Amino acid sequence: PTSNASAEFIKATWELQCNATPVKYQNSLFQDLNPSHNHLSKVKLNQELWGDFIFNIDSNAFSLSQELSQGSQQSTLLNFLYFGVEHILTGYDHLLFILGLLVLFARWRLFLSITGFTIGHSLSLFLGSVGIVIAKMNIVEALIGFSIFFLGYEYFYKNFFLSRRQYFRFWQLMPLGILFLLWVLGIIGFLLFCGMTVFVLSYSKIILDDQEMVKPLLITAFFGLIHGLGFASNLSGAGFTDNLILGVLGFNIGVEVGQLLFASIAMLALALITRLFGVQALILSKHGISSLLLSFGIYWFILRML
C-alpha cells in the first residue's frame, strides 16, 4: 500500500486481485482503539467506481459482486446521508449549539435562526470539502466552542443582567476579560485576540435589538459557517473526486435530518416540562441549559486552543 499522512487524516490505497466472487471486504482498523473511528472508502471494481463506503464499529464489512446492482451514485448518497445523521447525533458540541438556539429564540425568530445556521454550515461544508476553503482545524473547533459560549452569554445578557444595572457592565466586559487573559497566557495569538475582540464588541451591540428580523439569520449564519468547516473536516482530503457532489449532498442532508430530529425531541421535552410543571420550571430549565452553554463553550474553546 501507499499512504499519505497528515495531522487530520491518513490516506491509503490498496489494490487486490480476487478470482472468487462475491468478495467480502472487512475493515476494522483502529476501532479497538477508538470505537467512534470512521473509515471513508472509495471502491473500484475493474477500474470502474463501485461506490463510496463508510466503515464504523456497527458496519465494518460489505459484499462486492461483479454486478453493479446498487449503483455507485445511490450507494454514495445513502452512505453519506447515514454518516451525516450519525455525525450530528454524536457531535455533542453541535447539539448543544442547536439546544442553545431553542432556548434563546422563539417562534419566527427560532425559524430564522435555524435557517441561518443551515445556510451557513451548508455553504462552508461544501467549500471546505472541495478544498476551496482551508482552515486550521484546532482554531475552527475552538471557535465552535466559543459560539456555544456566546449563546449562553446572550441568554443571560438579555434575561438577567440587562435588568440589573449594577452587574450589567461586568457582564459586558466579561468575555473581553477572558480573551485578554488567554492572550496574556499565550493560549491565543494576537491576531485572533484582536479579531475576537472586535466580534465581541459588535455582538454586544447587535443582540440588544430584538426588533430587527434579519439579525437572527445573519448571526446564526455566521456561526453556521464555523460549524460547517468542522463538518467539512470529516470529508476533506478523502479523495472522493468521482462522486464528490453526491457525497457532500448526502452528508449535508444527513446533518439536516439529524438536526431536525434532535430539535424536535428537545422542543417536545421543553413543552412537556411546561405542561407538567409550569412556566417557572421552563425558565429554570432554560437557566440550566444556558449555564451548560457557558461552561462547556468556554471549556471547549480553551481546551482546543491548547
PLM regions and their residue ranges:
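Acidic-enriched, low-complexity/disordered segments with a strong bias for Aspartate over Glutamate
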Residues: 32, 52, 58, 93, ...
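Active-site-proximal inter-transmembrane loops
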Residues: 75-82, 240-250
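Hydrophobic alpha-helical transmembrane segments in multi-pass membrane proteins
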Residues: 86-226, 232, 236-237, 243-247, ...
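N-terminal soluble domains immediately following signal/targeting peptides that reside
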Residues: 1-86
